Amino acid sequence: SSQGVDYCKIKCPSGIHTVCQYGESTKPSKNCAGKVIKSVGPTEEEKKLIVSEHNRFRQKVAQGLETRGNPGPQPAASDMNDLVWNDELAHIAQVWASQCQFLVHDKCRNTAKYPVGQNIAYAGGSNLPDVVSLIKLWENEVKDFNYNTGITKQNFAKIGHYTQMVWGKTKEIGCGSLKYMENNMQNHYLICNYGPAGNYLGQLPYTKK
């Protein structure tokens, strides 16, 4: 997926590229000690679900059918792309997921093509939480979003997963994941990378129709 790319040449203001720092391997790192890793990376079926759930939700918002918000409803969009899966984004996301640095964003995940955004979700239980339930955690942040305010330093922590999900100009997605047992719980950890990135402070996630 990323053969022949020298990620050490891809610069980010915030630091060294994940694949430059950790290498191409997606094998779980020493940090994962104590966790019984059941599987690394989404299945083909899960990849389809990730894309279809994102596009279902993006279309719902674009059509003006999302009634939640602070205040709701969310305005319809005139520039909402449908997302497609990108293996390079997924590979970079998986290298980072396999480091077991939980709920922390990596410093640099860009590709030669564009800057890359990121959403992270995690859930555990006696049954394995499915991938769509993780994505819905991001969608649910819409309840706190005021479209007219856009993205600010103050609200970013509460709404940033939602706004990246519905960033109109984003076109591609690729995700990494780990499923593992710990303390008798089945855990599902998901990292999705988005290109081109969204979530610029002071900007609106999409153009109002």
Curated annotation (Swiss-Prot):
It is found in: Secreted. SUPFAM superfamilies: PR-1-like. InterPro entries: Allrgn_V5/Tpx1_CS, CAP_dom, CAP_sf, CRISP-related, V5_allergen-like. It comes from Polistes annularis (Paper wasp). Disulfide bonds join 8-20, 12-108, 32-100, 175-192. GO terms for cellular component: extracellular region. It comes from the Eukaryota. This is Venom allergen 5. Belongs to the CRISP family. Venom allergen 5-like subfamily. Residues 52-194 form the SCP domain. The keyword DNA-binding does not apply. Residues 1-4 form the signal peptide. Keywords: Allergen, Disulfide bond, Secreted, Signal. Expressed by the venom gland.
